[in-house]
Amino acid sequence: MDCPSNVVLLLLQLVLQRQQTLAHRDKSVDLQTLLKDPVIDNDVLVEFKTHKLVQLYGPQYCRDISLRGLKTMVTDIFANGIPKNAQSSGNDQPVTVVDLANYYYMQRINELQNTELPQLKEALLTRLEHMI
């Protein structure tokens, strides 16, 4: 799966929100179970396809992704899991949507701090030098 981390993070946030909604509507549904094995339905698909972030950073997902494709994408995210070096030691619990979202959130912060902000700073300094 070659998807930007910010798009993956958004997808996980939308999935989490949907699981919470389902658990609140139907008290017989256990939220912890949904977090380990989330329900991916048309509501998640529509939210994902129409989100501005997806339109900007992953326009191919706005056009081409079906419900089956979105389910496969989420399954792949769960299958990839969290790298061992990023997990807390001794954690043998099944990975949840929250765990994955936290991991991708930290990954995105690192991308911003180590890549995008320095590039932006360099571009601003270059522009400023040309103005002087």
UniProtKB/Swiss-Prot annotation:
Compartment(s) where it occurs, according to its Swiss-Prot or TrEMBL record: Nucleus
One GO BP annotation of this record: chromatin remodeling
Highest taxon in the source lineage: Eukaryota
The UniProt record lists the keyword Transcription regulation: yes
Pfam families for the chain: SWC7 (PF17330)
Main localization (coarse): nucleus
Gene Ontology CC terms, in alphabetical order: chromatin; nucleus; Swr1 complex
Record's keyword terms, sorted: Activator, Chromatin regulator, Nucleus, Transcription, Transcription regulation
Physiological role: Component of the SWR1 complex which mediates the ATP-dependent exchange of histone H2A for the H2A variant HZT1 leading to transcriptional regulation of selected genes by chromatin remodeling.
Similarity comment: Belongs to the SWC7 family.
Summary of subunit composition and partner proteins: Component of the SWR1 chromatin remodeling complex composed of at least ACT1, ARP4, RVB1, RVB2, ARP6, YAF9, VPS71, VPS72, SWC3, SWC4, SWC5, SWC7 and SWR1, and perhaps BDF1.
Further details from the record: Present with 4240 molecules/cell in log phase SD medium.
Protein name as annotated: SWR1-complex protein 7
Source species: Saccharomyces cerevisiae (strain ATCC 204508 / S288c)
Gene (UniProt): SWC7
